[in-house]
Amino acid sequence: MDEEVKLLGSWLSPMSRRVEVGLKLKGVSFEFSDLDVFFSKPPELLQHNPVHKKIPVLLHHGKPIAESLIILEYIDETWPNSGIRLLPKDPYERAMARFWAKFFDDKCSLTLWMSCWTEGDKQQQTLAESKLNLTTMEGALKGKKFFGGDEIGIVDIIVFCSVYWAEIAQEVVGVDVINEDKHPILCKWMKETVDSKVLKDYMPPREKLFCHFQTYKDAIAALMNARFGSN
């Protein structure tokens, strides 16, 4: 590699996958360190992200950058002339992309996951929140090919990764979080994006994720319910 670029992540993490996709769409060569972070915190992770102790972490010339949205912006700014633009050039459109990316992370990412893996009142609460907030996201997509218009950008990357994971998880656990009746615009965008293979080719095989969720569903559910409760 011409530059020292290393990503600390996990093939199981949609947050980590966002950064992988961003690097690949920008044409940046990188080393991937696949860490087992779900039941322990590897020393390498604690060394480079001692504050949040979470993946992903991007190492560029040995300097760590944490948090997936911050990393994606860093990638776009560091390699502005390589690959596609992750954020629009126009200042207003750029601000809107940041707004919707943050909205999705704040309002949708965790509730989608909790909708699949929690139980009882907590699950019903997060199911309702997911439906409402995904409908709000559809408003940003209505009448467009992608969230940013005609080209894939940062919002498409983060939403696609999370929804791809959630659609598989909901099938494993038998929960109806996302479907065409509830979210027709989002499902249409998802299908067309999958068919275009622009992002789909960068996702882990569906069967691999399905088998993992099926094998560890009790452990994942126990972890989520212990952390967030079922009532």
Question: Over which residues does each language-model region extend?
Answer:
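GST-like domain detector, emphasizing the conserved glutathione-binding G-site
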Residues: M1-F147, E151, C187, D218-N231
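Non-globular targeting/processing and membrane-anchoring segments
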Residues: T135-T136, V163-I168, W189-N231
